[in-house]
Design a protein with these regions (language model features):
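Glycine/Thr-rich phosphate-binding loops of Rossmann-like dinucleotide-binding domains
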Residues: 37, 97, 120, 168-170, ...
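Anionic group-transfer/hydrolysis microenvironments
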Residues: 32, 92, 115, 165, ...
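Short, glycine- and charge-enriched coil/turn segments that flank and shape catalytic ligand pockets
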Residues: 105-107, 126-129, 174, 200-201, ...
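Histidine/acidic residue-rich metal-binding segments in metalloenzymes
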Residues: 2, 6-160
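C-terminal cap of metal-dependent C-N hydrolases
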Residues: 175, 229-295
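C-terminal/domain-terminus segments
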Residues: 96-102, 288-298
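Glycine-rich, flexible loop/turn motifs
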Residues: 115, 131, 135, 179-182, ...
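His/Asp/Glu-enriched, well-ordered alpha-helical/loop segment
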Residues: 52-83, 132, 153-154, 158-160, ...
Length: 298
């Protein structure tokens, strides 16, 4: 429902309504109003005549709070009208949180997700990180970030995801219009959440709910997301007293960069077990270990 990286836009209301009314599956939506975004771009081009790009800090005003809220509100209303199951991805604003209910995930037909970028960064970080934190939806104000953090524990946010988008650094050149949106985020997603717990944002017990249990429940993923007899052994061991700094050579994404560079973390992933097999241990990625396709209980 919002134009982002890739050709996946569906924004005609009649088409959307048909999808909402007929799909037996959980619908997952990226919600930004393309018409509002395009109007904002036109306004900036009029203001800065002759310029084909703008400083990256304007990205959050182009992909604005209004653009996010208008699209999310439309999706929620369609879900209510049709009875569809809806999951809104990467909610980025305090205002959007007004659309969701505080109750157990098992009782919800409309759920919401936050991503690491919006929980860790804000518009104040553009000055130091520039296009490295350019993503869609854009990072918002510190007040929006605070509201998202609070929603991790008050029942409004059900899932935390990575929105992992490992673009090359060369693709991140430019400003608000030219630089590609997205950032690599898988490697530092869990330690970021553990740091938020350390800061008192959420209890540590809430992290597996948001990052493992609830995704498995929502998408009916077979034998994943829980430590149970008969389930696949997908486990992570962490060191709570590592006290380390992110440096080049300490990250594993093939794109070769991270917005977390030079950040200090107290926690560190020490071992990753996938399908019962150690895939990573104390800085060493084990060659030849491969994942398995997910299966869904429909």
């Amino acid at each position: 429902m919002g134009s982002s990286t890739g050709n996946m836009l569906v924004d005609r209301e009649e088409s959307l309504y048909r999808i909402f009314a007929t799909s037996p599956l959980l619908l997952m939506a990226h919600c930004e109003s393309t018409s509002i975004i395009e109007a904002n771009i036109r306004a900036f081009k009029k203001k800065y005549k002759g310029q084909n790009d703008f400083p990256v800090r304007y990205h959050s005003r182009i992909r604005s709070v209004e653009a996010c809220y208008a699209s999310s509100a439309l999706a929620v209303q369609m879900a209510k009208d049709t009875g569809a199951r809806l999951h809104i991805a990467h909610v980025s604003t305090a205002r959007e949180l007004e659309l969701f209910e505080r109750k157990p995930i098992e009782e919800k037909k409309i759920t919401a997700e936050a991503v690491i970028a919006h929980l860790m960064f804000s518009t104040e970080d553009y000055d130091t990180l520039g296009t490295r934190i350019k993503c869609n939806p854009a990072v918002k104000t510190p007040e929006d970030r605070a509201a998202l953090r609070e929603a991790l524990t008050n029942g409004l946010i059900d899932v935390v995801a990575t929105d992992h988008a490992p673009h090359l650094e060369s693709e991140k050149l430019g400003g608000a219009l030219r630089a590609v949106s997205g950032m690599p985020m898988i490697q530092f997603s869990l330690v970021s959440m553990l740091e938020l717990s350390e800061m008192g944002v959420l209890p540590i017990e809430r992290i597996p709910d948001l990052m493992a249990h609830n995704p498995a429940k929502l998408f009916h993923i077979e034998k994943r997301g829980f430590i149970r007899p008969g389930y696949y052994a997908d486990l992570v061991l962490v060191d709570p007293d590592a006290n380390w700094q992110v440096r080049e050579g300490r990250y594993y994404t093939k794109c070769g960069w991270t917005p977390m560079d030079e950040r200090f973390f107290k926690w560190r992933v020490s071992r990753t077990i996938m399908n019962g097999i150690t895939a990573y241990s104390n800085g060493i990625v084990v060659d030849g270990v491969r994942g398995k396709e997910l299966r869904f209980e429909i």
